[in-house]
Amino acid sequence: MIRIICGGKKNAGAYSEIIAEYEKRLRKPYDIHWEFYEEEKLLKKLEKWPFDEASEYVICCDERGKNISSDEYSSILTGVFENGRDVVILIGGAYGFDKSVREKADFVWSFSRLVFPHQLFRTMVVEQIYRAQEISRGGKYHHE
Protein backbone atom coordinates (compact mmCIF):
# COMPACT_ATOMS: atom_id res chain seq x y z
CA MET A 1 0.00 0.00 0.00
CA ILE A 2 1.04 3.58 -0.59
CA ARG A 3 0.07 6.25 1.93
CA ILE A 4 0.22 9.78 0.59
CA ILE A 5 0.40 12.33 3.40
CA CYS A 6 -0.27 15.90 2.32
CA GLY A 7 -0.16 19.34 3.81
CA GLY A 8 -3.09 21.48 2.71
CA LYS A 9 -6.62 20.94 1.50
CA LYS A 10 -8.14 17.75 0.11
CA ASN A 11 -8.08 17.02 -3.60
CA ALA A 12 -10.74 19.04 -5.40
CA GLY A 13 -12.10 20.02 -8.80
CA ALA A 14 -10.84 18.69 -12.10
CA TYR A 15 -7.64 17.38 -10.51
CA SER A 16 -9.62 15.15 -8.14
CA GLU A 17 -11.39 13.60 -11.14
CA ILE A 18 -8.07 12.82 -12.82
CA ILE A 19 -6.65 11.42 -9.57
CA ALA A 20 -9.75 9.23 -9.13
CA GLU A 21 -9.34 7.86 -12.66
CA TYR A 22 -5.74 6.79 -11.97
CA GLU A 23 -6.74 5.35 -8.58
CA LYS A 24 -9.29 3.08 -10.29
CA ARG A 25 -6.46 1.58 -12.35
CA LEU A 26 -4.15 0.87 -9.41
CA ARG A 27 -3.83 -2.65 -8.00
CA LYS A 28 -2.25 -3.89 -4.78
CA PRO A 29 0.36 -3.10 -3.61
CA TYR A 30 0.10 0.20 -5.55
CA ASP A 31 -3.25 1.12 -4.00
CA ILE A 32 -3.35 4.55 -2.37
CA HIS A 33 -4.58 5.83 0.97
CA TRP A 34 -4.70 9.64 1.35
CA GLU A 35 -4.15 11.61 4.56
CA PHE A 36 -4.60 15.39 4.64
CA TYR A 37 -3.44 17.73 7.40
CA GLU A 38 -3.36 21.44 7.94
CA GLU A 39 0.24 22.42 7.35
CA GLU A 40 1.02 23.20 11.02
CA LYS A 41 -0.50 19.89 12.17
CA LEU A 42 1.47 17.99 9.56
CA LEU A 43 4.75 19.55 10.69
CA LYS A 44 3.97 18.66 14.33
CA LYS A 45 3.12 15.09 13.32
CA LEU A 46 6.42 14.79 11.45
CA GLU A 47 8.41 16.11 14.42
CA LYS A 48 7.52 12.85 16.20
CA TRP A 49 8.35 10.85 13.03
CA PRO A 50 5.43 8.40 13.26
CA PHE A 51 6.85 5.92 10.76
CA ASP A 52 8.12 2.40 11.35
CA GLU A 53 11.48 1.86 9.63
CA ALA A 54 10.95 -1.88 9.43
CA SER A 55 7.62 -1.68 7.60
CA GLU A 56 7.52 1.73 5.90
CA TYR A 57 9.74 3.36 3.28
CA VAL A 58 9.35 7.15 3.43
CA ILE A 59 9.67 9.27 0.30
CA CYS A 60 9.76 13.03 0.85
CA CYS A 61 8.84 15.13 -2.19
CA ASP A 62 11.05 18.20 -2.33
CA GLU A 63 12.66 20.23 -5.12
CA ARG A 64 16.02 19.75 -3.34
CA GLY A 65 15.80 15.98 -3.74
CA LYS A 66 17.07 13.62 -6.41
CA ASN A 67 15.59 13.75 -9.89
CA ILE A 68 15.02 10.22 -11.23
CA SER A 69 13.44 8.57 -14.25
CA SER A 70 10.10 6.75 -14.21
CA ASP A 71 11.99 3.46 -14.62
CA GLU A 72 14.14 4.24 -11.58
CA TYR A 73 11.04 5.17 -9.57
CA SER A 74 9.36 1.91 -10.57
CA SER A 75 12.46 0.00 -9.44
CA ILE A 76 12.41 1.76 -6.07
CA LEU A 77 8.74 0.93 -5.46
CA THR A 78 9.17 -2.66 -6.67
CA GLY A 79 12.13 -3.16 -4.33
CA VAL A 80 10.23 -1.73 -1.37
CA PHE A 81 7.22 -3.96 -2.00
CA GLU A 82 9.42 -7.04 -2.54
CA ASN A 83 10.93 -6.39 0.90
CA GLY A 84 7.46 -6.44 2.46
CA ARG A 85 7.32 -2.74 3.23
CA ASP A 86 4.70 -0.11 2.50
CA VAL A 87 5.48 3.26 0.92
CA VAL A 88 4.76 6.61 2.54
CA ILE A 89 4.93 9.67 0.29
CA LEU A 90 5.13 13.07 1.98
CA ILE A 91 3.87 16.10 0.06
CA GLY A 92 4.39 19.35 1.92
CA GLY A 93 2.27 22.44 2.09
CA ALA A 94 3.17 25.85 0.74
CA TYR A 95 6.51 25.95 2.57
CA GLY A 96 7.60 22.36 2.00
CA PHE A 97 9.61 20.47 4.62
CA ASP A 98 12.53 21.49 6.75
CA LYS A 99 15.92 19.81 6.66
CA SER A 100 15.15 17.44 9.55
CA VAL A 101 12.28 15.82 7.60
CA ARG A 102 14.39 15.47 4.47
CA GLU A 103 17.21 13.88 6.49
CA LYS A 104 14.92 11.30 8.12
CA ALA A 105 13.26 10.22 4.87
CA ASP A 106 14.54 7.13 3.09
CA PHE A 107 14.49 9.00 -0.21
CA VAL A 108 14.00 12.66 -1.17
CA TRP A 109 12.37 12.83 -4.58
CA SER A 110 12.40 15.85 -6.87
CA PHE A 111 10.23 16.06 -9.94
CA SER A 112 12.03 19.23 -10.93
CA ARG A 113 13.60 22.33 -9.44
CA LEU A 114 10.34 24.03 -10.38
CA VAL A 115 7.57 24.45 -7.83
CA PHE A 116 4.09 23.19 -8.78
CA PRO A 117 0.58 23.96 -7.49
CA HIS A 118 -0.44 21.34 -4.89
CA GLN A 119 -3.35 19.86 -6.81
CA LEU A 120 -1.30 19.51 -10.00
CA PHE A 121 1.63 17.97 -8.13
CA ARG A 122 -0.58 15.40 -6.39
CA THR A 123 -2.00 14.46 -9.79
CA MET A 124 1.53 14.02 -11.14
CA VAL A 125 2.51 11.83 -8.17
CA VAL A 126 -0.49 9.54 -8.71
CA GLU A 127 0.23 9.33 -12.44
CA GLN A 128 3.82 8.30 -11.67
CA ILE A 129 2.58 5.63 -9.26
CA TYR A 130 0.35 4.25 -12.01
CA ARG A 131 3.24 4.44 -14.50
CA ALA A 132 5.51 2.61 -12.01
CA GLN A 133 2.89 -0.12 -11.64
CA GLU A 134 2.67 -0.51 -15.41
CA ILE A 135 6.46 -0.56 -15.85
CA SER A 136 6.70 -3.22 -13.14
CA ARG A 137 4.08 -5.45 -14.73
CA GLY A 138 5.28 -4.87 -18.31
CA GLY A 139 2.15 -2.96 -19.33
CA LYS A 140 1.85 -0.86 -22.48
CA TYR A 141 1.27 2.50 -20.75
CA HIS A 142 4.96 3.46 -20.52
CA HIS A 143 6.97 3.89 -23.73
CA GLU A 144 10.72 4.31 -24.03
What do these predicted regions represent?
Residues 1-22, 26:
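N-terminal beta1-alpha1 ligand-phosphate binding loop
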Residues 5-7, 61, 90:
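Short hydrophobic segments within beta-strands
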Residues 10, 63-66, 93-96:
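Short glycine-rich anion-binding loops that position phosphate/pyrophosphate groups of nucleotides
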Residues 15-19, 70-74, 102, 122:
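Conserved strand-to-helix beginnings and helix N-cap segments that scaffold or border functional pockets
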Residues 17-24, 47-50, 101:
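Short, aromatic/basic amphipathic alpha-helical patches
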Residues 27-88:
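S-adenosyl-L-methionine/SAH cofactor-binding core of RNA-modifying enzymes
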Residues 72-99, 107-116:
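Catalytic beta-strand/loop module used to bind and position nucleotide/cofactor moieties
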Residues 99-143:
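Structured adenosyl-cofactor binding patch, chiefly the S-adenosyl-L-methionine
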